[in-house]
Amino acid sequence: MTKSPLTLYLAAPRGFCAGVDRAIKIVEMAIEKWGAPVYVRHEIVHNKFVVDGLRAKGAVFVEELDECPDDRPVIFSAHGVPKAIPAEAERRQMVYVDATCPLVSKVHIEAERHAEHGLQIIMIGHRGHPETIGTMGQLPEGEVLLVETVADVARIAVRDPARLAFVTQTTLSVDDTRDIVAALQARFPQIVGPHKEDICYATTNRQEAVKAVAPKSDALLVVGAPNSSNSRRLVEVAAKAGCSYAQLVQRADDIDWRALDGIATIAVSAGASAPELLVNEVIDAFRARFDVTVEVVETAVEHVEFKVPRVLRQPA
C-alpha cells in the first residue's frame, strides 16, 4: 500500500533546556557519589520518562522532606523550593543538593532584593505550580501576591501602590505575560519590573519556534508531560498562532491517529523537560504510516550550559 506524503516540520529549538539538563545530571552524579537511594523532593523535572529512568537508577521521589530519612542525601527539584525547605534540611543535618534552575534562582534573588527595599512583590504565575510555590516561599506569607490573569490585576489589594515590584514564573506564555505586565503598569504606574524579563530563554525560544511552524501545519504535536507548564504553553501558543489541531502527547502511544486523518503537514515540538528520544519515537511513528519528509525549522541556536554544584564535582 502506498503511503500518503507528509511534510513534518520539526521545531528548533525544542526539548531539554540547560536547567533540565543540569538537574538530571545532579541526580545521576549524586547516585554515583553517594550510592542509592538518593531522595528527590518532587519530580526533578516534569517528565514521567525521565523520572522513571532515574528511579530505575536509585532515585526515590517524594513530595515532602518528612518522607526522607536524615541519613540519606536529598535533592531539591529544578523548580525551586520555599526557603523553609533547606532550613529544615539543615536543622536535621541532612546532606542536600539544590537543583533549582539558576534562572529560577535569579527570580528568587530579585524578589528578595525588592523586599529588602521595602517593596511588596506581585508574582505573575500559576497557582499551585512548584515554581510559584518556591518563589513565593522566599518571603514571609503575605509579602508576595499572585496574579494569574489580566482580570486578577484589577482585584488585588496592595499595601501601597507606589511601593510595588513584579516577578514572573519562568515558563509562562510570553504573549499572555506581556498583557498582564501592561495591566499592572496601567494600574500601578510606579511598579518596578525586572531589568530583563524573567521568562527564560528556553521558554521564549521554544514558543517562537512553535509560532514559526504552527501557521503552515495542519496539526501540531508537543511532546511533553501534562504537568509541564512550559509544554502546555506551547500547545496554547500553537493554537493562537493559527494551528487548528494542537495537542500534547507524552509519547508516540498517545497520538490520536483518527484526528490526524487526511493531514498533509504536521509540526512537532517538545517541552523543555522532554528528551529527544521521545521526539524521535514520534517521528518514527509517523514514518510507519506516512511517506515523511522532515524539515527542520530553526529560529534560534542555544549554547547555554549551567555547572552542577561544587559538592558533586568534588571526589567523595
Curated annotation (Swiss-Prot):
Ligand binding (isopentenyl diphosphate): H46, H79, H129, S228, S229, N230, S273
Record: active site: E131 (proton donor)
InterPro entries according to UniProt: LytB/IspH
Protein name: 4-hydroxy-3-methylbut-2-enyl diphosphate reductase
Gene: ispH
Cofactor: binding comment: Binds 1 [4Fe-4S] cluster per subunit.
Pathway: Isoprenoid biosynthesis; dimethylallyl diphosphate biosynthesis; dimethylallyl diphosphate from (2E)-4-hydroxy-3-methylbutenyl diphosphate: step 1/1; Isoprenoid biosynthesis; isopentenyl diphosphate biosynthesis via DXP pathway; isopentenyl diphosphate from 1-deoxy-D-xylulose 5-phosphate: step 6/6
UniProt keyword 4Fe-4S, yes or no: yes
UniProt enzyme class: oxidoreductase
Residues reported to bind (2E)-4-hydroxy-3-methylbut-2-enyl diphosphate: H46, H79, H129, T170, S228, S229, N230, S273
Enzyme Commission no: 1.17.7.4
